[in-house]
Amino acid sequence: MGSPMARHLASKGHDVVVYNRNTEKAKQWVEKNGGSFALTPREVGEQCEIVMVCVGNDNDVRNVVLGADGVLAGLKNGTVLVDHTTASATLARELSAACTAKSVGFIDAPVSGGQAGAENGALTVMCGCDDQKVFDRLRPVFDAYAKACQRMGDAGAGQLTKMVNQICIAGVVSGLAEALNFAMRAGLDADQVVEVISKGAAQSWQMENRSKTMVRDQFEFGFAAEWMRKDLGICFDEAKNSGADLTMTKLVDALYARVIEMGGARWDTSSLMKLLTHPPK
C-alpha cells in the first residue's frame, strides 16, 4: 500500500524520502520514482515536514515511530506525523499525546480501497486529529492518492471509523459468498444473476469488484484473510470497551480462521467462498 501511495505523492511534485526495513526495496523505489531513501525512520523524520507511516500492526507502528531511531525522535516542532496503518484507537491516542509533547501534529488516517485503490489513487481516508488546522493543512496532500477524506473527530476517531468499515465488509462478503454459492447450486448463471441484482438494493463494492473472481475460484490477490483477522481482532478489543455486540462479526471471523487453516492466509477476503465451494473435509 505504501509504495503506490508514495509514488502518487512523488508524481504530484512532492519531494519524497522513503524508508523500508529492506533497504534494497527503498533503493529500487527511488530508482523508479525519484526522491531519496533513508536508512532509519529517524532520518526520515529529520528530513521531512510530513511523515506518513503505513505498516502492519500496533507493534510495527511503535517500532517505527518510538525509540531512539524512531520517526518521532527526528521530527521537529511544527511537523506532522500521519499513521495510515489500520491499528487500535488506543495506539492513535498514545501517539497523539507523544506528538503533542514535542509540538508535532498527529493524524490517525487508516485507508480503505485496497491495493487497487492505492494503485489508482482512489483511496478513502478516515482521519482522527485533535487539531482541525493540522487536518486542513494535510487535506490537499491526501488528495494525491485519495478520492475521499474526512476528519471524523479527535485522535482515534479515524481508527474507530476503519473498524466500522471492516465490520461492514465482513458481513457483506459472507452474505455475497453464500448468495453466489446458492445461485450456482440452483443452476443459475452467477454472472447474469449479479448483473441483475447489482442494479438493485443488493449492490455493493464487493459484488462489483469480487463476484466474478469468486465464482471462478480466484483468490490469489487482494486483502489477505490473515490481515482481515488482525483487523477484526482490533474491532473485538474495542467492542469490549464500548459494550458493542459483534456476535455476527465473530461468526465471520471464525470462518476466516477456517480459510487460514485451509492454507489461505494470503488469499483475498472473498475467499470465504472457498469454504462453500470446496468445503474442508
Q: Predicted regions: what is each one?
A:
Residues 1-53, 79, 84-85, 115-118:
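NAD(P)+-binding Rossmann beta1-loop-alpha1 motif at the extreme N-terminus of oxidoreductases
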Residues 86-167:
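Rossmann-fold dinucleotide-binding core
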Residues 16, 37, 99, 105-107, ...:
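Hydrophobic beta-strand scaffold residues
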Residues 41-105:
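Rossmann-fold NAD(P) dinucleotide-binding segment
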Residues 121-127, 150, 154-186, 197-209, ...:
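Active-site-proximal catalytic alpha-helix in oxidoreductases
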Residues 155, 159, 203-269, 278-281:
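Interdomain hinge/lid region at the active-site interface
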Residues 5-9, 95, 182:
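Hydrophobic residues within alpha-helices
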